[in-house]
Amino acid sequence: MSRIGIIIGSTRDKAVGKVVGEWLNDVAQGRKDGVEYTLLDLKEFDIPVLTTEVVPAAANKQYEDEKVQAWSDAVDACDGFIFITPEYNRSVPGPFKNAFDCLAAEWAGKPVAFV
């Protein structure tokens, strides 16, 4: 069975993306397509700013920080992703970019979609 991670890309307290992500997850859970959907809220992972000396591509999915390791395990368990992200200053929010940059191999070869 494939697993799709629905990633809420904003960490703001009243982020609209959380409402959208929860709605999408509810709709997806009702589908009979043989796909498992899991909601991954960046705010709950509380990922620290990337400052490690070992770049993620060389970390072999083993991270010193337990929060980054938990994030790695959650992302690695997924076969694809739907990113729910706002646009801040013509880009994604900093916490979303940081969360993406903290990992490397976990993303490789997996399809993505954006909302």
Show which residues each predicted segment covers.
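N-terminal beta1-alpha1-beta2 submodule of the flavodoxin-like/Rossmannoid cofactor-binding fold
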Residues: 1-85, 90-98, 102
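Short, acidic/small-residue loops that bind anionic groups at enzyme active sites
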Residues: 102-115
